């Protein structure tokens, strides 16, 4: 089965990732499937924490899956997290991850990958455009880490075990779950990023957990009007 993602300024061929997608029982998929996304510019990067434009987010949501997703009507749906709950004061949110969620290299997607990604987001060394997003989410120590007053390891997130991700907020955030759909909060394959650094985002190194795998990239030479 083959999936393709096409752009007006860039053509990106993606293959179907069976590990990441849950297909409803009885659904018959075509042998070849295509998604066409009309972007106005070439994506700068496929690192979800180092980009901020629409072209990049359009790709990121195909290559990576977050804690929750939204359907065509904007309603929240389980992503890597199959369920979640909060304390009565809306300051602590616990996400229970699917044990069958896999990275495209076969490794399991764990709570540690989310902890790593969120810490990396607020780390000043990352220079992430949306670093302040975790401050908006009221995550403990987020702003102090961004300002260089505390270490990324002090961010208010934890992996209670491989499949339980916990977020601690300084103030009540009743809408926290909906905020986790943002591209900057997508997980990253910790082992791969730690080993390769910024080179992890190259096509030959890219590891995702979304519905598609990155295969080829082709810059267009002309426009068809």
Spans of model-derived segments:
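N-terminal lobe/hinge region of extracytoplasmic solute-binding protein
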Residues: 38-88, 205-209
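A structural "hinge/loop" feature
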Residues: 22, 41-57, 80, 107, ...
